[in-house]
Design a protein with these regions (language model features):
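Positively charged n-region of N-terminal signal peptides that target proteins for export
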Residues: 1-5, 15, 24
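Bacterial N-terminal signal peptides
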Residues: 20-36
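Short hydrophobic targeting helices and cationic amphipathic motifs
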Residues: 7-10
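Small beta-barrel nucleic-acid-binding modules, primarily SNase/OB-fold domains
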Residues: 2-3, 17, 36-280
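A ubiquitous, low-specificity "background" feature that marks scattered single residues
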Residues: 12-15, 30, 71
């Protein structure tokens, strides 16, 4: 570590060391003020420091993870997936979808000024704007949903905060909070996977019993009969689970289920799809 004394001894002097630091602070403060945004406590937002790209006005709450803005844009919350409401046929809505929407409505109201922070990809395939959403009080809406069990963590793109979102989801699952109290959403044991799960996105729980390298994949084998395929080209991103200390550990894997060569399997593309249960 370079101390202020060392800087002074080197001839730079503390005056010159502090000057650029203070200037950078002032520039940062000025950029926030130019957006009219107040800084929220970092204690409130566990995952993402409060910062924003744009101020917007809320017009409508569509469901637990989608909002409509006054300017007509649809906002899809990055990194979470709440139960879907079928607006055309309400009876087909997913379990706990109305509760998730009601929770968002308890945090926001029409006309509220919100702050958005955009991810690396601006739009999803449906033309919705992808964003982290901060309430008027500076709270991250995604974090609130995950903590209370009104949404699950789900990564569709490069998401720098996925590990924090995964921890929040795991805590909610452990407490059977919100949607996690229902079998519809709870991770399924490998022994109960059946035809009804084919080609559906599921959470599957099992114990790592072996590893296997075959073809283009490294296979994580759960309970001796369920295979999780990790592309060898991207295996470096999965170092936490591709380790000997993962053997005999319980994991939860999420993804679309396939049945091939008489084996149930999930092919993963992002490390967020595999989580160690009760990590040390």
């Amino acid at each position: 570590m370079i101390s202020q004394r060392n800087l002074t001894d080197s001839g730079l002097g503390s005056r010159f060391w502090l000057g650029p630091y203070l200037m950078n602070c002032l520039l940062l403060l000025g950029s926030l003020l130019s957006l009219g945004l107040a800084q929220a406590s970092t204690d409130d937002n566990l995952c993402i420091p409060y910062t924003a790209s744009e101020k917007v006005t809320l017009a409508h709450i569509n469901d637990g993870d989608t909002l409509t803005l006054k300017d007509g844009r649809l906002i899809r919350l990055i990194g979470v997936n709440a139960p879907e409401i079928d607006h055309q046929y309400p009876s087909l809505s997913q379990r706990y979808s109305l509760e998730a929407r009601a929770f968002v409505a308890s945090k926001l109201k029409v006309g509220d000024e919100l702050a958005l922070m955009f991810g690396p990809t601006k739009l999803d395939p449906y033309g919705r704007t992808l964003a982290y959403v901060f309430t008027a009080d500076g709270l991250l809406l995604q974090q609130e949903l995950l903590q209370q069990g009104f949404a699950m963590a789900r990564v569709y793109q490069e998401h720098p905060f996925w590990e924090c979102f995964a921890r929040l989801e795991q805590q909610a699952r452990t407490q059977n909070a919100g949607l996690w109290q229902f079998d519809d959403y709870a991770p399924r044991a490998t022994s109960v996977i059946g035809q009804q799960d084919l080609n559906h996105y599921r959470l599957v729980r099992g114990v790592v019993t072996d590893f296997e390298r075959k073809g283009q994949y490294l296979w994580l084998i759960l309970d001796d009969n369920f295979y999780v395929g990790i592309p060898q080209a991207g295996s470096g991103n999965f170092s936490k689970v591709l380790a000997l200390n993962s053997l005999k550990r319980a994991v939860v894997v999420r993804g679309k289920l396939y049945f091939s060569y008489k084996k149930w399997q999930i092919i993963v593309s992002h490390p967020s799809q595999i989580s160690l249960e009760n990590p040390p």
